[in-house]
Amino acid sequence: MQRSPLEKASVVSKLFFSWTRPILRKGYRQRLELSDIYQIPSADSADNLSEKLEREWDRELASKKNPKLINALRRCFFWRFMFYGILLYLGEVTKAVQPLLLGRIIASYDPDNKEERSIAIYLGIGLCLLFIVRTLLLHPAIFGLHHIGMQMRIAMFSLIYKKTLKLSSRVLDKISIGQLVSLLSNNLNKFDEGLALAHFVWIVPLQVALLMGLIWELLQASAFCGLGFLIVLALFQAGLGRMMMKYRDQRAGKINERLVITSEMIENIQSVKAYCWEEAMEKMIENLRQTELKLTRKAAYVRYFNSSAFFFSGFFVVFLSVLPYALIKGIVLRKIFTTISFCIVLRMAVTRQFPWAVQTWYDSLGAINKIQDFLQKQEYKTLEYNLTTTEVVMENVTAFWEEGFGELFEKAKQNNSNRKTSNDDDSLFFSNFSLLGTPVLKDINFKIERGQLLAVAGSTGAGKTSLLMMIMGELEPSEGKIKHSGRISFCSQFSWIMPGTIKENIIFGVSYDEYRYRSVIKACQLEEDISKFAEKDNIVLGEGGITLSGGQRARISLARAVYKDADLYLLDSPFGYLDVLTEKEIFESCVCKLMANKTRILVTSKMEHLKKADKILILHEGSSYFYGTFSELQNLRPDFSSKLMGYDSFDQFSAERRNSILTETLRRFSLEGDAPVSWTETKKQSFKQTGEFGEKRKNSILNPINSVRKFSIVQKTPLQMNGIEEDSDEPLERRLSLVPDSEQGEVILPRISVISTGPTLQARRRQSVLNLMTHSVNQGHSIHRKTAASTRKVSLAPQANLTELDIYSRRLSQETGLEISEEINEEDLKECFFDDMESIPAVTTWNTYLRYITVHKSLIFVLIWCLVIFLAEVAASLVVLWFLGNTPPQDKGNSTYSRNNSYAVIITRTSSYYVFYIYVGVADTLLAMGFFRGLPLVHTLITVSKILHHKMLHSVLQAPMSTLNTLKAGGILNRFSKDIAILDDLLPLTIFDFIQLLLIVIGAIAVVAVLQPYIFVATVPVIVAFIMLRAYFLQTSQQLKQLESEGRSPIFTHLVTSLKGLWTLRAFGRQPYFETLFHKALNLHTANWFLYLSTLRWFQMRIEMIFVIFFIAVTFISILTTGEGEGTVGIILTLAMNIMSTLQWAVNSSIDVDSLMRSVSRVFKFIDMPTEEGKPTRSTKPYKNGQLSKVMIIENSHVKKDDIWPSGGQMTVKDLTAKYTEGGNPILENISFSISPGQRVGLLGRTGSGKSTLLSAFLRLLNTEGEIQIDGVSWDSITLQQWRKAFGVIPQKVFIFSGTFRKNLDPYEQWSDQEIWEVADEVGLRSVIEQFPGKLDFVLVDGGCVLSHGHKQLMCLARSVLSKAKILLLDEPSAHLDPVTYQIIRRTLKQAFADCTVILCEHRIEAMLECQQFLVIEENKVRQYDSIQKLLNERSLFRQAISPSDRVKLFPHRNSSKCKSQPQIAALKEETEEEVQDTRL
């Protein structure tokens, strides 16, 4: 970053913001980068501001029982706030003085006041000086208030983040990430823009009093007629506002429903394509969109009338103010034009400034109260540790997670009852789940000495993770004692990867020890994986390690835990995603050898691990089922295997235990998710809700249990979207995932394989947040690239095609040599995304406008209609203006003129009625024309939005995965949320306002030019200067706004990342470290935002200076060239003053339109994406009636055809090569093999070897070369839909969308209820579905959060059974699966798919033994394709993974299955029960 010119700027330069000229000049000539941004002043740094506010808040907490955050803010910012408020007031007062001088100028042209003609020139000079003074007062005041608002936001940002890291887990249970992001974005952003309006709450009453006094002097009592109309108008607008809020609240629920389905579609786009559900999802979303648009139109019409009321109120304010006076005393031009000027100021104050100020205070105080509530929440309590303790002791410990699951079922009950489900089933369902809290752990006792290994086992929901949480202090015991040293290291069950390099993730801010680091890398089997990356361990990992396989993420998380030197290591199921061989090697080399002298607690269900543990603790229903050694376990608990394996399944648990399990499940995922989606409750909820957050959580568009990665989209309403947000989505060559799978691990669909030797990111470092956060934002450093990997620095050289994931990488400090790649990944909120800066121009192109206009043919005619009506309005206006400006000489005899009267009456009493009728007629005409003009425009623009949404949705669903892999899932969702919201809400009204303002200005200039042609000469250079200045500023401002948005993303991403890894972060004691990272992210954003505010104020001042020059020219031309006639001078000067304010408004509106049209550009970019191949590429042999059916014919009870394809399921693969993107490195090379009909093939290979990629290639989800044939039909001879329907798919990443059970099983509604029930019974789902009210019509929300992971897998299995597919693809179906569900899946595979070809990717040896052939994948290629006997006889991975004793028994197991030798199986079961139960139990 460069040193800011502000530091050495003079007072004049600061006053006129001239110090911003270098950045404006540079932005006009070239593309700006973050390195071009100036450093922030030290007073604006997050460290200083947060320390200042935190000190005052602590003082408030210590001194009062009811602390108020507003008091702390007042002590920090009050005096500067009031100083700028007084400047703002003085600037507003000048507006009231200007009409007085205008009246004197008009009066000087009275033929009877010729002696005053000589002072007209001085009055003109005074009038111009007032404009100059107003400019010099208002702009510094507005900028100062924006600056204070920015400082308040920064200070509260920091305070909230620090508090978040301290919150207790029980409080975090009731707070979703969506609520926190809303607190930081929607609420705190009000201070940035709103603080400048806050002072009008007291300025407007004073201004109104002053103006009414001046108007009273002119018109006496009739002045209150105009004020009364304004008050009525303000009340009318308030009523419209309430109506609009009602429509907005109704619409918010519909938007939420649409975004729920859309987000689920995006995060599971691979599954949608694999299931061929594109049309079903499109229809589902479009139906929701139709309902939403009905409410959108109603809200838009109300907003339109509200906006129109302001524009047309000017006629009636003047009319009602002057009418009573004119009827009594006649019309005096001086008074008319002075009153018009007063009314312009009065109208703005009463109808705009005061309501905005009241709304600002309402919003700001509400936000402060929410933040105050949040800051007083219960904090995390660190347990008292004894640092001299060498043992871990737990005595009679009992603990509860607070009840909270009941509210989920209450909502489910309410939501489904609203759908008129049967009430008879409610008791059946809810009686199964007690709503009372039950202990998650009861009376736990154990003691382990230093260096011992304690293995904790148990069935699903037994309390294993809760035990670790209690040791870490996250779960506070209600009874008993816990004793240990406090030096803990922790490895989570679901891997938490911090955006950054592999090295940074493992070191995690701890001092670097080369020998220890290399030892850990080797023990965790990461050497081979790291060696395949071009940058080795310095490769930048993306969102949650999205570029890695699930096994690689798990090993990095384990390596982080092992690298830390601690006394106690807590390992929560660290081997869940590892293949058998890798798991075995890591357990031996890492857990048993490298950590041999450390105390370890390992959560596992592997029998081999239990054998080698010093102590074993088996939990059952939260209680200690057994504690002792393995030999004691065999002797004392002969039934331990059923308890350990969980044969007492979830459905057999007692009601109390079920409630405890489900509560714990929600608790474990609540940090990563929002509350369940309420389909009926749409209103936003405050953080202060009857003392607890959990009562009415904010609607989420994402499910909390579906995964550990969880974000909430904070949907801004039209009233809240005050700013124009610029976003940027940088392409990343990786798997598309909005919510990386936490439970499911590696998905069947695309993922970057570690075998790829090419760069997984197209560019690892771009100058931007990544580099600038390497150093303090307050200090300038020259940064150069250093090639040594261990001390690598970051280059400032611009590199294209890097995502914000990489932008936010950096070290904590130069001195420590530590590097932390900070987070930039997200989505969940509109502020968190941004588009590829290279792909969208800094300024919206004319082509975008032209294309937008031609989207709907009616729009062109509507615009022509607007132009015609505008010409009619101008003609109508000229009638009154001409009449006033060209009044014939009055008749002395009939005139009411008196020489004693100080005011000239030009029009007779009789003719005044004639003027009155003309004025009323013209006003009514203008009002009617204005409404007729605007309504069709707004209606048509919303129709255009509807068309664009439909086209974009269709385009995304039909886009190939090679294209989607280069896009951020969050960016795609942002197009459907923020950009569509802009097209629906902001763009129509903004375009209407701009057109309205532009026509007003053009009309006023035309009238002035007609009345005084010389003025037109002054108008031409003003228009040219305006166009040039706007173009000059826009080129820079849009880039600054984009960089500001890019700088904002790390703030929210850092918050989300910190919350996801909060347990890990606390266990490692890295809170201060992450606070430093957060402050530097804030400082980076502040640098961008401060510069944007400064350049914006520079532009506003220049625009106003141009207007002042224009007004000076108009004033003196009018004074010097006008002869006799008050009317002409009055019209010209009044219109000139009106032009000044309106044109400045129009300029800002034009900039807003240009900014909003960037959303249209982004939508067009998505619409233009390529589509998947949908037609056969060459002719094939016809199957029926001489033609190949467009719809795949699948054998089922409904479709009985003579020719059915596929009939056998034979697959032939020839020279298959797969890539994620065109031109990318091959993930699989020259794969060739064949599978016989009905054969079962197992895929073997290390994690990341490409097994899942091969399954994706079968479905044509990747860029592939070569050929695959099914029953002799080549894949390039039929459509994609036909090809994919030949497969049944059971992916790791379970796809349950928000909808009924029936919709989830049969989205195309092809099957009858009876057939669905038969399949549900076959896969073991019937008992699950029947316990829900409504049964098949029960609406699942939040990714089916009320279902266990096993039940979700059964849903996928049921889909495959219904499809009657002949080829079944299974990718890790047993990952994190309870044994009961696993056994159901095995049984179903044997029965329902007995005649099908099955391709299985699995880590369980037991499941793989049922395969006839095995395909071994190594280094992108097929190494072996043989039977199990040959693999065991040769030196293979499979052989290495199985012990010799196992091998001896496996052959009999295989042979017995062939010759049906039951005695051998029985003997095997009796002799070695534990070997048969070989893997996860």
UniProtKB/Swiss-Prot annotation:
It is found in: Apical cell membrane; Early endosome membrane; Cell membrane; Recycling endosome membrane. The keyword Cytoplasm does not apply. Residues 99-122, 217-222, 320-339, 880-918, 1012-1013, 1117-1130 are extracellular. One of its GO terms (cellular component) is apical plasma membrane. One of its GO terms (biological process) is response to endoplasmic reticulum stress. It catalyses: ATP + H2O + closed Cl(-) channel = ADP + phosphate + open Cl(-) channel; chloride(in) = chloride(out); hydrogencarbonate(in) = hydrogencarbonate(out); ATP + H2O = ADP + phosphate + H(+). The modification Phosphothreonine is found at T717. ATP 1 binds at W401, S434, G458, S459, T460, G461, A462, G463, K464, T465, Q493. Residues 1-77, 147-195, 244-298, 359-858, 940-990, 1035-1095, 1152-1481 are cytoplasmic. The chain crosses the membrane at residues 78-98, 123-146, 196-216, 223-243, 299-319, 340-358, 859-879, 919-939, 991-1011, 1014-1034, 1096-1116, 1131-1151. Binds and hydrolyzes ATP via the two cytoplasmic ABC transporter nucleotide-binding domains. The two ATP-binding domains interact with each other, forming a head-to-tail dimer. Normal ATPase activity requires interaction between the two domains. The first ABC transporter nucleotide-binding domain has no ATPase activity by itself. This is Cystic fibrosis transmembrane conductance regulator. It comes from Chlorocebus aethiops.
